[in-house]
């Protein structure tokens, strides 16, 4: 059946699809007025969707790499679908949340579009870097193979083969740093920003707008930031979720106005 469909349909992209669905659900919750739901849940639920998207993005690559023998097209598809999903989850969703909380004037609309454009630019450039990285790795592997073939002592020293092969191991080529702020970081940035909402009241929109602008600029400014692995990223997202959930609970108990 899957051979009759375009795309990849196996567990390697399942988490990416799950995160994408969460992002779409968050957008819908933010846009739809439900008369049976308290107003504050119209952005609290989308924020939890945003954090769930962050968790999915943390693990999608880990899960994908568990499948051995993936073709180049499968790997490329995974990379492309991840970026497209990130645009929805970490580009469009935060902007829609901003629209929901009141950033609806023409000036604010320009800001929301600016934020989405910066996210789009960053993700497109990331894809360019990944393609360049793949080409460089292929050239290095070809050069390494040529060196092995030209080495007269290769058969007498099998350890040399292992050492040469290790130099092109993709796991050794994984990036350790990003240039600019990764879009996935908004999974914890904006929920933390929302922690100030009960205390700022009608002025919170200005804080959220400022956060959108600063984060958007950081998407494209060239500075080095360490890449967090799953073990490092998950505690950060969970901690932010707990802080946000605790504040929501506290606001309900104290009847703080959101």
Positions of PLM-derived features:
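Topogenic membrane-insertion module of multi-pass membrane proteins
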Residues: 1-61, 218-258
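Short, amphipathic, aromatic/basic-enriched membrane-interface segments that mark the entry/exit
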Residues: 6-14, 76-84, 173-180, 228-231
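Lipid-exposed faces of alpha-helical membrane segments in multi-pass integral membrane proteins
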Residues: 11, 15-21, 49-52, 88-91, ...
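Multi-pass membrane catalytic core of lipid/isoprenoid biosynthesis enzymes
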Residues: 13-17, 66-126, 194
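Helix-coil boundary and interhelical linker segments in multi-pass alpha-helical membrane proteins
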Residues: 25-47, 88, 94-113, 193-207, ...
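Transmembrane alpha-helical segments that form the membrane-embedded catalytic/substrate-channel core
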Residues: 57, 116-129, 213-226
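Membrane-helix interface/capping segments
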Residues: 61-74, 132-137
